[in-house]
Amino acid sequence: MKTLQPKDIEVFVTQAGKRLCRGSLQHEIAALRGLLRFLALDGRVPPGLDKQIDTPRLYRLEQLPRALPWPMVTELLKSLDLKSDIGLRDYAMFLLIATYGLRASEVVELTLDDVAWRKGVLRIHQRKTASALELPLTNEVATALTKHLKRSSPPAPYRRIFLRKRAPIGVLKPTAVTEAFQSLVRHSKLSIPFEGPHCLRHSLAVHLLKSGTPLKTIGDILGHRTAESTSMYLRLATGDLRGVSLAVPRSRNTGNGVRP
């Protein structure tokens, strides 16, 4: 590795850029820089290689949200095996994301105390905004949670709704939700290009927008801090926006050069 040259790094970054979006490439380059600095201190690569890498420029909201057509979301959920413990757990998790736009971290942190069954309320602790949100508990979600808990009630001292299904039993991590989603996509045979459950969150936002839900309401549900974060979904609903646009009257020439 002592013969490593800047051109070798450039080849690696170029190849990585073919499979990664610019945001992911930026993270990859940051990790690579750290590795090169460490190896240079250890004398295993020439010093200064970490400074030879250009970081791709990112623009806020430049990428389109990763949304699926709503019928595909429904079909994906239907493909789960509801006869198995894991199938019931995963169905409840992904239904929560598709219904409320939860993040994976918010799903795994749900506890039995967050569900007010009699009041019909679900309490969400939004990490990103450090706020709590109370949403109506839909019948479909309540049924899914009930079936999951009847089959897999969390043992003491756990209060989390979703736990590991294989030993050792413990809390579920957000990465496990991603892995479960990837497994679901593979078994569903659906053509879904996205690798994480976050696409269900984006799909809900676009579905609500196309259904006429105000942008402010969508932002509140998703836990966005600013309206700008929610407005990015407008780019996926341009066809619907054209349908409600107002016609611009054409100007008429009166013959004397004056337009009324």
Language model features with spans:
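Conserved catalytic core of the tyrosine transesterase superfamily
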Residues: 1-260
